[in-house]
Amino acid sequence: MENRDLKMAEKIAACVADKGGRTFLVGGYVRDLLMGKHSKDIDIEIHGVQPKELENILDGLGSRTEMGASFGVYGLRGYDIDIAMPRQEEATGRGHKDFKIYVDPFLGTYKAAMRRDFTINAMMQDVLTGEIIDHFGGQEDLKKGVLRHVNPHTFAEDPLRVLRAAQFAARFSFSIAPETIELSQTMDLTTLAHERVMSELEKALLKAAHPSIFFEQMHKMNQLDDWFLHLTQLIGVKQPEKYHPEGDVWNHTMQVLDSAALL
């Protein structure tokens, strides 16, 4: 976290504590911290104060921006921090916007973390004390290099999480838990918006040392056909063994992809 943003997060946390609440770093920041990586994902979650109280705190610290006030997400102008309140989501349709959102300042850390996609992204860190809150074994999965979904019901509500599993597997060279692969095989990706798919693909191609893992995991989850049919069609296409000891055109393409990532 940038020092300036960290100091602001601490100021927010101190004001929240004065009102009887707690402030946690959540999501990618905590994961990256434990992996020894620098993170630009600066997300904090405010527990134990009402939305109006939080708004008053933010107004006293700077120029508040409403990134989604109706579902408890704010910002401060000039700072790269996302400020959210605990919330629950209920799917009302198949699209990524088809959700009812319920803000609940007193939801508790367990239920708040349950809406996260993977255990490694469900950890929290108290901004003031540094305490790590890990309800779902994220630290252990991080040590083992495993991507495991937190909750099968919330995971299945957003099919983008299948692509996120493949993307994280490629970026971190992690494996995907068998139960997560099995769940992902049942999910329908055809409803996803093109730009959401391309965003995950871009991360895999530009941030992973071995982007082939993204496509290999998508194939393992039986999810290549809907978005990457042209790659599926390469599987089993033979090449002259004399010139291509790596095997079929699929293997050749994956090797070329990984070589390109080194450039």
Q: Language-model segments: what does each one mean?
A:
Residues 1-263:
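Catalytic cores of the polymerase beta-like nucleotidyltransferase superfamily
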